[in-house]
UniProtKB/Swiss-Prot annotation:
Active site: 420 (nucleophile), 708 (proton acceptor)
Organism: Mus musculus (Mouse)
SMART domains documented for this protein: C2 (SM00239), PLAc (SM00022)
Pfam families with a match to the protein in the record: C2, cPLA2_C2, PLA2_B
CDD domains per record: C2_cPLA2, cPLA2_Grp-IVB-IVD-IVE-IVF
Activity control mechanisms: Stimulated by cytosolic Ca(2+). Stimulated by anionic phospholipids such as phosphatidylserine.
Chief place where the protein resides: cytoplasm
Location of the region described as Required for localization at membrane structures in the Swiss-Prot/TrEMBL record: 865-875
Residue positions binding Ca(2+) 1: 97, 103, 153, 155
Protein name in the entry: Cytosolic phospholipase A2 epsilon
Gene: Pla2g4e
C2 domain residues: 60-183
Catalytic activity as recorded in UniProt: a 1,2-diacyl-sn-glycero-3-phosphoethanolamine + a 1,2-diacyl-sn-glycero-3-phosphocholine = an N-acyl-1,2-diacyl-sn-glycero-3-phosphoethanolamine + a 2-acyl-sn-glycero-3-phosphocholine + H(+); 1-hexadecanoyl-2-octadecanoyl-sn-glycero-3-phosphocholine + 1,2-di-(9Z-octadecenoyl)-sn-glycero-3-phosphoethanolamine = 2-octadecanoyl-sn-glycero-3-phosphocholine + N-hexadecanoyl-1,2-di-(9Z-octadecenoyl)-sn-glycero-3-phosphoethanolamine + H(+); 1-octadecanoyl-2-hexadecanoyl-sn-glycero-3-phosphocholine + 1,2-di-(9Z-octadecenoyl)-sn-glycero-3-phosphoethanolamine = N-octadecanoyl-1,2-di-(9Z-octadecenoyl)-sn-glycero-3-phosphoethanolamine + 2-hexadecanoyl-sn-glycero-3-phosphocholine + H(+); 1,2-di-(9Z-octadecenoyl)-sn-glycero-3-phosphoethanolamine + 1,2-dihexadecanoyl-sn-glycero-3-phosphocholine = N-hexadecanoyl-1,2-di-(9Z-octadecenoyl)-sn-glycero-3-phosphoethanolamine + 2-hexadecanoyl-sn-glycero-3-phosphocholine + H(+)
Bilayer topology term: Peripheral membrane protein
UniProt remark on domains: The N-terminal C2 domain associates with lipid membranes upon calcium binding. It modulates enzyme activity by presenting the active site to its substrate in response to elevations of cytosolic Ca(2+).
């Protein structure tokens, strides 16, 4: 199976209000009979905390059908269940208005059942409102269902006030057991919300699930809809019917009617089969006789058709108004996903590594003068890790690679990762399938020509007009264009003489024989209105596939940008050209104000705390006696108190990202497995507050918001730390401004926090006295890679023009570089260098590699010995 991006916020199971009619387009219904069936097996959940469980003799113990621990995806059948939520009442409701009591109502949102929010009626001016209203949801207990109960104050003249939200994990419920809960919202004021839950079997629905233990893809149906006009048209212009299917990928479409029996125009809707979806259809406005009607047109009432009772393959006809009929047929979608669910490497990368090992083994035998060749399991996986820094990182990486090539370490490397400006070098190199076997001095000379050229012609009207046409085409293909795309066009102009139509997937030609290291480009996925502290996710790109290791979800790189739903490809969009990827990978304009403050100050907690919602776990409040649980892994029940109006306004200003790159989310529609937090792979990358709030994670988002990784930590280590890649030696090439050791120290701290095997930070020197190379290891951790760290500094290069070759007095000036000073020609904002500045930086980078050959060989031998010991004593 493969993987890809798109998304919205719709999900899977439906819900209906037990005491009220349907809201929306209309209430006229045609309801076929419901087929009955038997449930294959039963699934129970636990009781918890401040809950009173009734009828304990009927409780069914937990027996999950799809308890996932493996790294690959699995398929199985699981029944759906009916959940009834009875909102009983509240006591001591907090006062929202100064002059009167709260006009209180409660909304219910369960996104794993439906995107529609349900609400109780409003009870005005009451301290102890009582509703006694019931709502019914159809849920899948193999996914993480968290019900959000929001208490609101209704205002007639202004926007309703959101007082608080209770997040309740439904995995605490026992099957066939009424659970009576009093949520202690404010123990000091004795404010509480009283709710009753009942989970029952649904004997008519059992669906096929595909999961990797973190994400779950549910069964999807396709509804084909034709519209027929029952009388001849008098006009040439067709009037379309407006058709909406709730919780579907398409949501709303216009369907042109035609004459029977030919149906040239049809619409397709894709929806989760067991979400209790509704179809709403509205006929075109009809003209009235002015003698009988005060207006010239008459709006037809919409009609509604529930879809959960349609039989697959059977055509159902629905009258719409007086003159139209809808003919609809439901059919199951394929269970084969286009998103690859799994944490292992894709087959293409596995095959590449096997081919590359042959190249590496031959190179190492010559480098180390080995008497015997290396066995396959003895060949170390060496990776080159480059950081960001604009043109400075691009130019320095050329110099470093030139040095590594001369030492044969380039041919010994299996991976090369980069972010920001380093990706400019990588993308240029991989346009040539044989680049690493050629003398890189030719490529460096060509790069020099472009770095020193004048960039002002890029802003001339004729050039801007061409870019405008390109961006319009990009938008017409289905992409949301931003200033980041313009930035990508400017990078393209700065790196070459003509338009580059290459794609990321085209770089596979440079890997087909294992002739070059595998390039991996890194960004982070963020939220438009949330600080990086609260939410960020690693997102990697390779010529084979793109995806997120935290979820174990990947798609072929040529499908990046296409639209997906529940793991299935809905609409293929042309793969973006490389210039747009370069703009994305170095999207320096996507930073919000709060993240900028965090990067430049150590006292960021002031703004962070002042603008953040208050979270209060009420799991341990001794309001009610504890009840034994059947499930060991429920989320804590949490009360979320919104920020004040002023804080919220301030936060919107601070967290807004006006130029963030948006791409269709290939996880859209999928849901999280009920035990996703216990999954070892997810836990490895679970590093933000929102990871324990499943309704806020990426699978519910329409778009991915991708950002330059340097805004979190200026390194591209994450792809190399995946245990599946088994990297033994990482050559860290640092190009960041400011503290040279900060990215490495941040990575060490991150790995310690996440329990990822990595060396401890052991550099004692300050930035003014750093050495050219450090070798770091962690002898206590067998799986920790060896790290050879190269800060971008000018040390012995000031006196030596080559290792062991001193400079003459006339050459001393060539060894002086102002890399990080206030008037440095290498500042991150600089796109253009002088020829002298370019040459100095390339020679410095090359020299630092060549001058530390012995340390690189030392690091290599350590990595090989560690790998040999690990293979002899597998853990």
């Amino acid at each position: 199976m493969q993987s890809i991006p798109h998304s919205d916020e719709a999900d899977v199971a439906g819900m209906t209000h037990a005491s009220e009619g349907h809201h929306g387009l209309g209430t006229s219904m045609l309801v076929p009979k419901n087929p009955q069936g038997e449930e294959d097996s039963k699934l129970g959940r636990n009781c918890s905390g401040f809950e009173d469980a009734q009828d304990p003799q009927t409780a069914v113990p937990s027996s999950p059908l799809l308890s996932m621990a493996s790294c690959s995806s699995q398929e199985g059948s699981s029944p759906c269940h009916l959940l009834t939520v009875r909102i009983i009442g509240m006591k001591n409701v907090r006062q929202a208005d100064i002059l009167s009591q709260t006009d209180c109502f409660v909304t219910l949102w369960l996104p794993t059942a439906s995107q529609k929010k349900l609400k109780t009626r409003t009870i005005s001016n009451c301290l102890h409102p009582e509703w006694d209203e019931s709502f019914t949801f159809q849920i899948q207990t193999q996914v993480k269902n968290v019900l959000e109960l929001s208490v609101c104050d209704e205002d007639t003249l202004t926007q309703n006030d959101h007082l608080l939200t209770v997040l309740y994990d439904l995995s605490k419920l026992c099957l066939r057991n009424k659970t009576h809960v009093k949520f202690p919202l404010n123990p000091e004021g004795m404010e509480e919300l009283e709710v009753e839950f009942l989970l029952e079997e649904n004997f008519s629905s059992s669906e096929t699930l595909i999961t990797n233990g973190v994400l779950v893809s549910r069964q999807v149906s396709c509804l084909e809809v034709h519209a027929e006009s029952r009388r001849p048209r008098k006009r040439k212009k067709n009037k379309d019917l407006l058709v909406m299917v709730t919780d579907s990928f398409e949501n709303t479409q216009r369907v042109p009617p035609c004459q029977e029996p030919c149906y040239p125009n049809s619409a397709c809707f894709h929806y989760p089969k067991y979400s209790q979806p509704q179809l709403y259809a509205e006929a075109p406005k009809s003209h009235c006789n002015f003698r009988l009607c005060c207006c010239g047109t008459h709006r037809n009432d919409p009609v509604c058709q529930p879809l959960n009772c349609l039989s697959d393959g059977q055509v159902t006809t629905l009258p719409v108004g007086e003159n139209y009929e809808l003919h609809m047929k439901s059919s199951p979608c394929s269970d084969t996903l286009d998103v690859r669910l799994g944490f292992s490497l894709c087959q293409e990368e596995v095959e590449f590594v096997q081919k590359r090992k042959m190249v590496v083994a031959k190179t190492l035998s010559q480098m180390l003068q080995l008497e015997e060749g290396l066995h396959e399991d003895e060949v170390p996986i060496i990776a080159i890790m480059a950081t960001g820094g604009g043109t400075r990182s691009m130019v320095s990486l050329y110099g470093h690679l030139l040095g590594l090539q001369k030492l044969n370490f380039l041919d010994a490397s299996t991976y090369i990762t980069g972010l920001s400006g380093a990706t400019w070098t990588m993308a240029t190199l991989y346009s040539d399938p044989e680049w690493s076997s050629k003398n890189l001095e030719t490529v460096v000379f060509e790069a020099r020509r472009h770095v020193v050229k004048d960039k002002m012609p890029a802003l001339f009207p004729d050039q801007l007009y061409k870019w405008r046409e390109d961006l319009q085409k990009h938008s017409q293909e289905g992409y949301k264009t931003t200033f980041t795309d313009f930035w990508g066009k400017l990078i393209e102009y700065s790196l070459g003489d003509k338009k580059n139509e290459c794609k990321l997937s085209d770089q596979r030609a440079a890997l087909c024989r294992g002739q070059n290291p595998l390039p991996i480009y890194l960004t982070i996925n963020v939220k438009d209105d949330v600080s990086n502290q609260d939410f960020r996710e690693w997102f990697e790109f390779s010529p084979y596939e793109v995806g997120m290791q935290k979820y174990g979800a990947f798609i072929p790189s040529e499908l990046f940008g296409s639209e997906f739903f529940m793991g299935r490809l809905m609409k293929r969009i042309p793969e973006p050209e490389m210039c747009y990827m370069l703009g994305l990978w170095s999207s320096i304009f996507s930073l919000n104000l709060l993240d900028a403050w965090n990067l430049s100050h150590t006292s960021e907690e002031f703004f962070y705390r002042w603008t953040r919602e208050r979270l209060h776990d009420i799991e341990d409040d001794p309001i009610l006696p504890e009840i034994p649980r059947c499930d060991d892994n429920p989320l804590e029940t949490t009360v979320v108190i919104p920020t004040t109006w002023l804080s919220n306004t301030f936060r919107e200003i601070l967290t807004r990202r006006p130029f963030v790159s948006e791409f269709h989310n290939f996880l859209y529609g999928m849901q999280l497995h009920t035990d996703y937090l216990q999954n070892r792979q997810f836990s490895m990358w679970k590093d933000t507050v929102l990871d324990t709030f499943p309704n806020q994670l990426t699978q519910f988002a329409k778009h991915l918001n991708l950002l330059d990784t340097a805004f979190f930590v200026n390194s591209s280590y994450a792809p190399l730390l995946r245990p599946e890649r088994k990297v033994d030696l990482i050559i860290h090439l640092n190009y960041c401004a400011g503290s040279q050791t900060k990215p490495l120290k941040q990575t060490c701290e991150y790995c310690t926090e996440q329990k990822i095997p990595f060396p401890s930070f052991s550099i004692l020197e300050d930035d003014n006295s750093l050495k050219e190379c450090y070798v770091m290891e962690n002898p206590q951790e067998p799986d920790a890679p060896i790290v050879a760290y190269f800060p971008l500094i000018s040390d012995t290069f000031q006196k030596y023009k080559a290792p062991g070759v001193e400079r003459s007095p006339d050459e001393l000036e060539l060894g002086q570089l102002n890399i990080y000073g206030p008037k440095s020609p290498y500042a991150t904002k600089e796109l253009t260098y002088t020829e002298a500045a370019f040459d100095k930086l390339v020679k410095l980078s090359e020299y630092n590699i060549l001058n530390n050959r012995d340390k690189l060989i030392q690091a290599l031998r350590l990595a090989m010995e560690k790998k040999r010991m690990r293979s002899q004593c597998p853990s």
